[in-house]
């Protein structure tokens, strides 16, 4: 039983007016550790007991069985609990040492699937920093879902269909060069895409031409299909090279085109249920009863289907294929209205499992405060950015540890980890301004700072030649180690919070906090001092390294043993 549950149970024994779960949720962590480890505010009982909170706190402190705590004291309207440091540190260290990387593994999911729609770059366009958020948030959530006992299914819903392919075909036929595209596919295709968009602003006939080519593509015209397939194949080769660099993999690459033959069923279902109504020649579903003002546009007046039709087909396919417990869409916040419509249409169709679908939205990445745009050519391309991050990491490693044996591998882990960590430490609904120098810094709240704390611990353990004995009980009771013990003990709850909120930043902030607490401990403690407490201190280091490495893994970030 963890300490919060223990305290809630003790209070519940003498306070029938509150449920144990309610007491648990009311417990606070005092800002000053001199005021105890946990505190119960008595305000919540004042009305029911018709007594002043101070009097209630005093009464509770006297009646609680204090034998399981170092001390229980009333301070004003709070009951403050001082935990038994030696006993709890022994329990925590024993658990972490026994479990290793499986510490805090949970079984809520019982092997059920969670579908994750993530990354989803557009074919024939460069993989930019704008795509990074969906990729790294989705990848981190997959690790967190697995830690909670679910089986994640990572789906790269490629943007491999749409009018933009009509634009690209027109541009290629007008100005393209096969050899140039084969040599540098994404660069060349981007140039063509930017050029056609610029020229279409003054020449509307290009839009018409593009629409015609896309119609031919929908009708499986041979020339259009061959060009489309070529653009897709060349783009995927390049994307997969980047995914390998990021350490991200997928279970499915079924993109928009995959659902071309699955949309007629959606239209038939909507017709059969009497949900499709005509509006200005188009087919729509009214959603006013869900508080959604604009109807969902299912089919345009020219017969073309829309994103939502395709997403309805995808949702049905995924439910049938994976029978998901949850289905999440890691897509920018600007698509919020689309996903509200998607869920509402499925609900209207009678699919209550639409309640298990969540739009995991996120804010924008900017550069110098300006929004990034592929169409306008204002992009930060991921590949040169990753190369620059690795180079900067290599320079810092060279300065700190010139004799390091595997510098290239470590520089890669640090550079890539720095970019991913910086993104993930930001609350996902907030955007951030891209700043490579800040990302790769070894100081401050960064990935390299956390990685360096882990490498420092490994160095200490190597110097001491320490491996903990599984039949030994290690315990500590000094204030610095206690801060670390409390964080390690809280790790299972941190994972659950990150899971419940679809929020990797909770995990990233925990990793920063644990690294900071260890560095403070390292600065104030002679860890390798040859005294009776030495093995206890080393056991704490060992457990901290396990949890730091696991927290980083849940973020998709490596933890080098040397830096």
Curated annotation (Swiss-Prot):
**From what superkingdom does this record's organism come?**
Bacteria
The protein's enzyme class: ligase
Q: How does it assemble?
A: Monomer.
Descriptive protein name: Arginine--tRNA ligase
Entry annotated with the keyword Nucleotide-binding? yes
- Where, by residue number, is the motif 'HIGH' region? 121-131
Name the source organism.
Streptococcus equi subsp. equi (strain 4047)
Q: Does the keyword Ligase apply?
A: yes
What does it catalyze?
Answer: tRNA(Arg) + L-arginine + ATP = L-arginyl-tRNA(Arg) + AMP + diphosphate
Q: Which gene encodes it?
A: argS
Q: Name one GO biological process term.
A: arginyl-tRNA aminoacylation
Q: Which GO terms describe its cellular component?
A: cytoplasm
Q: Which PANTHER family match?
A: ARGININE--TRNA LIGASE, CYTOPLASMIC, ARGINYL-TRNA SYNTHETASE
Which keywords accompany this UniProt record? Aminoacyl-tRNA synthetase, ATP-binding, Cytoplasm, Ligase, Nucleotide-binding, Protein biosynthesis
Q: What is its EC number?
A: 6.1.1.19
The principal location of this protein is cytoplasm
Query: Which protein family is named in the record?
Result: Belongs to the class-I aminoacyl-tRNA synthetase family.
Q: Where in the cell is it found?
A: Cytoplasm
The record, for SMART domains, names:
Arg_tRNA_synt_N, DALR_1
One GO MF term? ATP binding
Q: Output the InterPro entries linked to this UniProt entry.
A: Arg-tRNA-ligase, Arg-tRNA-synth_N, Arg-tRNA-synth_N_sf, ArgRS_core, DALR_anticod-bd, Rossmann-like_a/b/a_fold, tRNAsynth_Ia_anticodon-bd
